[in-house]
Amino acid sequence: MEKEKLLYEGKAKKLYFTDDSEVLWVEYCDQATALNGARKEQITGKGALNNQITSLIFEKLNAEGLETHFIEKLSKTEQLNRKVSIIPLEVVLRNVVAGSFAKRFGLEEGIVLQEPIVEFYYKDDALDDPFINDEHVRFLNIATYSEIEFLKSETRKINEILKKIWAEIGLTLVDFKLEFGRLADGRIILADEISPDTSRLWDANGQHMDKDVFRRNIGDLVETYTEVLNLLENAK
């Protein structure tokens, strides 16, 4: 597999064409962002940690029979992905009250929800990724109602697998963000990444093991992510 010209550069990744039109070469970068990109910082080692964590998680999801874009890890900072057209939605699932959800409803963080809540956010930096509902998704021609139901059900299925993965290493999956994409034949599959950048994880003492250590200036991001990676590797 040969890496070719740059296709896209985002906040945390660079995507390259390959000599296979259906495969992308993905490089994870060291940039950390918060406040929807308003705060940016280069943190040496972050890209390698996220790539390795994401690779381990996606390997487990693939083994469970879920269809994802992940093919294989190439190096500490690189992986191969199936080429998809990203659906402009952030699909967020919440198991525990935290973050913006707590602020929106005036609740204390840490309340366990009776059942998981799935939310949609429209991926648009200029609009600050607004919270939207099913009808908005249809109005914007992002997805059909049947596709919306698939996104919800697939996210709930993924949640059950992820909760077990994280629980095995002593972490609670508080909430997380997923992105999905369409293959050339129109099928929708899981894409993007699953890491402490996109998940809120708490240990048994309530310590944050995710990007909140950067967002809230409460810890060292590299040390935290390294601990998460070590826990996952030791659980293999």
UniProtKB/Swiss-Prot annotation:
The keyword Nucleotide-binding applies. InterPro entries: SAICAR_synt/ADE2_N, SAICAR_synt_PurC, SAICAR_synth, SAICAR_synthetase, SAICAR_synthetase_CS. Pathway: Purine metabolism; IMP biosynthesis via de novo pathway; 5-amino-1-(5-phospho-D-ribosyl)imidazole-4-carboxamide from 5-amino-1-(5-phospho-D-ribosyl)imidazole-4-carboxylate: step 1/2. One of its GO terms (molecular function) is phosphoribosylaminoimidazolesuccinocarboxamide synthase activity. Keywords: ATP-binding, Ligase, Nucleotide-binding, Purine biosynthesis. Its EC number is 6.3.2.6. The keyword ATP-binding applies. It comes from the Bacteria. GO terms for biological process: 'de novo' IMP biosynthetic process; cobalamin biosynthetic process. Transmembrane segments: none annotated. It catalyses: 5-amino-1-(5-phospho-D-ribosyl)imidazole-4-carboxylate + L-aspartate + ATP = (2S)-2-[5-amino-1-(5-phospho-beta-D-ribosyl)imidazole-4-carboxamido]succinate + ADP + phosphate + 2 H(+). HAMAP family: SAICAR_synth. Belongs to the SAICAR synthetase family. This is Phosphoribosylaminoimidazole-succinocarboxamide synthase. It comes from Lactococcus lactis subsp. lactis (strain IL1403). The lineage of its organism: Bacteria, Bacillati, Bacillota, Bacilli, Lactobacillales.
